[in-house]
Amino acid sequence: MAGLNETPRGNRIHIAFFGLRNAGKSTLVNAFTGQQIAIVSDVPGTTTDPVSKAMEILPLGPCLVTDTAGLDDEGELGEMRVEKTLKVLESVDIAVWVWGKADGLVPDKRSGDRFPVFAAECRKRGVVVLEYKRGEDVEGLKKKIAAVKLEERMPGLLDGLVKKGDRVLCVVPIDESAPKGRLILPQQQVIRECLDKGLVVTVCQPSEVPSALCLVPSAARPESVPYQLVITDSQAFGKVKGLLPVPATRGASGTVVRLTSFSILFARQKGDLQEFVKGLEAIESLKDGDTVLVAEGCTHHRQCNDIGTVKIPKALEKLSGKKLKFEFVSGTDFPDFCVSLTSGLETASPFFHPSLIVHCGGCMLTRREMLRRIALAKEAGVPIVNYGLVLAMANGLKVEDVLI
């Protein structure tokens, strides 16, 4: 349960160690973290999959440190390991290239041939590249990493939407798909940000919305608006909208009560909300037999009424009036479509070209990962839309009803 109390993966600075086999990456990662998180051996190819450890590095803050397999791994399994290693680049902020000694196992020339290609790929992705020579001081490397000036971090979930003292209502359905004894991560993060911003936050289920509205005395309501913002789980949009008051006098923002969802807040923070809105137009153009890719940034146990595999497909078929085919990916899996990188580090994935991508809010993804997925879709000419927007439309709301 400790993971529930840690800074989410998507909000950490990602640092990964790259190089050839037996360059000393795992030894360095163990020394860097102060723990034996990676297996160390003289046998080439000991590290088979990326291994990560969450830690704090001041003044950077919460980080995720990842050890990777050697980029020169060989054979069928070796190629799969290299592919896994390169997947790490999709989320990394700082890449450390580990130079091995010219000891016969990893000649410097081979590493030297590959490093310029690797560094160029990192620069293209906006990743900071540092170098470490085997045997150098580990504390010195930590200081180098701590001194890195990363581009501005992603904005807060509620930036520009509320001010200190505002009242926020969070509507959290508890159904068969809800985890026992806790809230899901997006709800946790939004509620925490409400507290950080000095907001007065009320949390209830959809059925308790009328009671929550009565908690705010009329004298405390500017222009008859009980809450400055209502945030709901996307699947409850229709029910919550019907329970909110429609006073004759509109609020100061020009709306009755501002309504949005947890998913849309994350799309606004980590992705490109306008690109998602554009993607909605593609729903009307879907035809019978078209393939829709449903993508989630995390992996979790699927329940009988799972939002990604059950509710989103139902919503899309309702909106389009068509019988559709669905493919599902989760976690770090995301197709490169027909995009081919010419850096020499990657090869194109098997051709896959859906008619539409529907993506979750991305609470477990970094902003870099989310924007890369949007860019891949855009480059391949595949419209992409967010869970929250699809569910809002399926519940009879208009885009302008939920965009804030």
Residue ranges and their predicted role:
Residues 1-79, 83, 87-94, 99:
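Conserved G1/Walker A P-loop phosphate-binding module
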Residues 2-4, 25, 49-52, 80-85, ...:
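A generic local structural motif
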Residues 24, 135-151, 268-269, 396-399:
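Conserved GTPase G-domain signal focused on the G5
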Residues 38-42, 148-157:
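Active-site phosphate-binding and catalytic loops of NTP-dependent enzymes
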Residues 41-43, 131-136, 262-263, 388-390:
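Beta-strand->loop->alpha-helix junctions that form or flank phosphate-binding loops
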Residues 53-69, 73-145, 155-161, 182-213, ...:
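Conserved C-terminal guanine-recognition region of P-loop GTPase G domains, centered on the G4
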Residues 162-404:
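P-loop NTP-binding site
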